[in-house]
């Protein structure tokens, strides 16, 4: 459906089941041109050590025509928008996703959740907010979408939220998509794969986007070039190997 997937986990997050090589093979099979590995930040109980993220610099950029982005799904830690990504980790990473996870930041009231999410957006350290429609973390959706548009941060529609986790996300995600549409911001689609078999599956995301008539020209996954232009506008140095994507 789209040639870019921006959210997935490998065996480095020990509740996931596929390797980098598994994802490359599945990307080739499905025609995915560019994907980001985004294992959980180190404050999660079963997450990789911070050296895992620093050492991503040894990865090839391109394997058999498939581009690989070095990423993290960091954890929002507090109302000040601090995340568990710092120092040399930033030097090795292309894509910083951040979101709420109960083991790191327990659910709070809507005002507190909103304060934490907007502070994270405004920090300048994050490219995408993961699963902002999670019903366990109610937020002021309009305010979050406006902040995201202002700071050039995408809000994610997460396919896994409608299948395996975060039950009851549908209404919230429709509200998120509509608010991003009205604010003129960006949406990022993530399979949130924990196994390579679901790489590039945005079937449920598409239903959400269609329900609110979301414009294609505000979806980062439409092409590698669009996603890379977005990242470069946020300060990522151009990657010569990606020119052929």
From Swiss-Prot:
UniProt cross-references to SMART domains, sorted A to Z: POLIIIAc (SM00481)
Record GO cellular component, one term: cytosol
Residues the record lists as binding Zn(2+) 2: 15, 40, 194
Keywords: Hydrolase, Metal-binding, Zinc
The keyword Hydrolase appears for this protein: yes
InterPro entries: Phosphatase_YcdX_put (IPR023710), PHP_dom (IPR004013), PHP_phosphatase (IPR050243), Pol/His_phosphatase_N (IPR003141), Pol/histidinol_Pase-like (IPR016195)
GO molecular function: phosphatase activity; zinc ion binding
Cofactor binding note: Binds 3 Zn(2+) ions per subunit.
Cofactor (UniProt): Zn(2+)
Enzyme Commission (EC) number: 3.1.3.-
SUPFAM superfamilies assigned to the protein according to its UniProt record, in alphabetical order: PHP domain-like (SSF89550)
Binding site for Zn(2+) 3: 73, 101, 131
Family in the record: Belongs to the PHP family.
PANTHER family reported in the protein's UniProt record: PHOSPHATASE YCDX-RELATED
Subunit architecture: Homotrimer.
Entry protein name: Probable phosphatase YcdX
Protein species of origin: Salmonella arizonae (strain ATCC BAA-731 / CDC346-86 / RSK2980)
Gene behind the chain: ycdX
């Amino acid at each position: 459906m789209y040639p870019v997937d921006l959210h997935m986990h490998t065996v480095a997050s020990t509740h996931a089941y596929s390797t980098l090589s598994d994802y490359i093979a599945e990307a080739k099979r499905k025609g995915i041109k560019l994907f980001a590995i985004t294992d959980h930040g180190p404050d999660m109980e079963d997450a990789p050590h911070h050296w895992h993220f620093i050492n991503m610099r040894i990865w090839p950029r391109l394997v058999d025509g498939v581009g690989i982005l070095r990423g993290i799904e960091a954890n929002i830690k507090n109302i000040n928008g601090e995340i568990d990504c710092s120092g040399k980790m930033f030097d090795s990473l292309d894509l910083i996703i951040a979101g709420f996870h109960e083991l790191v930041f327990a659910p709070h009231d809507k005002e507190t959740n909103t304060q934490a999410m907007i502070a994270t957006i405004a920090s300048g350290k994050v490219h995408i907010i993961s699963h902002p429609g999670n019903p366990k973390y109610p937020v002021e959706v309009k305010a979050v979408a406006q902040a995201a548009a202002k700071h050039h941060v995408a809000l994610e529609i997460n396919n896994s939220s409608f299948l395996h986790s975060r039950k009851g996300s549908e209404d919230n995600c429709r509200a998120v998509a509509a608010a991003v549409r009205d604010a003129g911001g960006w949406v990022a689609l993530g399979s949130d794969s924990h196994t390579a078999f679901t790489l590039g599956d945005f079937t449920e995301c598409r239903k959400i986007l269609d329900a609110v008539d979301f414009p294609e020209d505000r979806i980062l996954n439409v092409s590698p070039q669009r996603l890379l232009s977005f990242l470069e506008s946020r300060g990522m140095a151009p990657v010569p190997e990606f020119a052929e994507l």
